[in-house]
């Protein structure tokens, strides 16, 4: 059993992009930014507990931070982890709460 305080630290934010919106509409999949040390089992448990939905599958990938230039200095953005969470048919997560009326 995964501790509740760990589950609250696993999910950081939903990742909103053109691709994530398209995947959400077609495949009933939600994209999250997650902790870099999070496992698929932890991500599944966190989504099911926090949003009260059933998760069918979880796919993860590590996003490598890009090197960026600021004036004459070179910097690097942080690496982060992305999770594609596929929900069971008929399940849905509403982030805006009916604001688009």
From Swiss-Prot:
Q: Which UniProt keywords apply?
A: Ribonucleoprotein, Ribosomal protein, RNA-binding, rRNA-binding
Cited InterPro entries: Nucleotide-bd_a/b_plait_sf, Ribosomal_uL23-like, Ribosomal_uL23/eL15/eS24_sf
Q: Which GO terms of the cellular component aspect does the record hold? A: ribonucleoprotein complex; ribosome
Where do the TM regions start and end? none
* Assembly, per entry: Part of the 50S ribosomal subunit. Contacts protein L29, and trigger factor when it is bound to the ribosome.
Q: Per its UniProt record, what PANTHER family does this chain match?
A: 60S RIBOSOMAL PROTEIN L23A (PTHR11620)
Function description: One of the early assembly proteins it binds 23S rRNA. One of the proteins that surrounds the polypeptide exit tunnel on the outside of the ribosome. Forms the main docking site for trigger factor binding to the ribosome.
Q: What is the protein's name according to its record? A: Large ribosomal subunit protein uL23
């Amino acid at each position: 059993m995964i501790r509740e305080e760990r589950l609250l630290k696993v999910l950081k934010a939903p990742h909103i992009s053109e691709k994530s919106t398209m995947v959400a509409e077609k495949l009933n999949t939600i994209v999250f930014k997650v902790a870099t040390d999070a496992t698929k089992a932890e991500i599944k448990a966190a989504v099911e507990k926090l949003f009260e939905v059933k998760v069918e599958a979880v796919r993860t990938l590590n996003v490598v931070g890009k090197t960026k230039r600021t004036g004459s200095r070179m910097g690097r953005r942080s690496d982060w982890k992305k999770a594609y969470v596929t929900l069971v048919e008929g399940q849905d997560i509403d982030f805006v709460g009916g604001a688009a009326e």
